[in-house]
Regions:
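Binuclear metal-dependent phosphoesterase catalytic core
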Residues: 172-203
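Active-site environment of divalent metal-dependent phosphoester hydrolases
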Residues: 10-15, 39-41, 66-71, 121-123, ...
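Core catalytic region of metal-dependent phosphoesterases/phosphodiesterases
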Residues: 2-6, 11-100
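Charged helix-capping and loop-helix junction motifs
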Residues: 45-47, 129-136, 168-171
């Protein structure tokens, strides 16, 4: 069974539609959604409804930092423009949509797979995995073979061998990647709604 893992949708309806259509055309039957469904984009209500519908059909979903900010209100430490986006987004959502975002867990586990928006060592701290050191720290925080997270907006894979040797690489689109079971893997799929790798297409 093929599983589509997507993250950082950021209220971008056009990108979400394209990615969902593509995943379905590739035979995706399971869905994992790694948070940040709102923020930046113009269609938060539509995107939240799509995510909620997938969750009702059995998808796994976790909360992102933008989802939390919209639910709890803008932090005083946020820049003025970021606070404005949070407040605007909140005003676009009805009570049921806000309740859905508030109900999302920080992490989920399915067998030997761990799902989180930012990292596994402090999910609610929203620290980024910017390199091998953070990736290893995240992998050490769980006994799962595979960890999936978003937040970075650029696709990357990290791996850790049984003797503690770490490596990383950027995946090549359309090329299958073998995942040897003697390694732990940390997978960052990229971003649907706001990629930051220089490619305007959704990751």
């Amino acid at each position: 069974m093929k599983c589509a893992v997507i993250t950082d949708l950021h209220a971008n309806r056009e990108a979400v539609e394209a990615v969902l259509d593509h995943a379905r055309s590739q035979g995706a039957e399971r869905w994992v959604l790694l948070g940040d469904f709102v923020g930046y984009g113009a269609d938060p209500g539509w995107v939240v409804d799509q995510v909620r519908a997938l969750v009702r059909q059995g998808a796994i979903a976790v909360m992102g930092n933008h989802d939390q900010a919209v639910v709890r209100g803008a932090s005083p430490s946020m820049r003025a423009d970021a606070r404005h986006v949070v407040e605007w987004t909140r005003a676009q959502l009805d009570a049921s949509q806000l309740d859905f975002l508030a109900s999302l867990p920080m992490t989920q586990r399915h067998g030997d797979q761990f799902y989180v928006h930012a990292n596994a060592w402090a999910p609610a701290g929203w620290e980024y995995i910017t390199g091998r050191a953070e990736a290893v720290r995240s992998l050490h925080a769980t006994d799962c073979r595979y960890t999936f997270c978003g937040h970075m907006h650029e696709p990357k894979l990290f791996h850790l061998s049984g003797i503690g040797k770490a490596g990383d690489f950027v995946p090549t689109p359309g090329v299958a990647i073998p995942l040897p079971p003697h390694r732990q893997w940390l997978v960052i799929p990229g971003s649907v709604g706001q990629p930051r790798d220089g490619n305007p297409a959704a990751c």
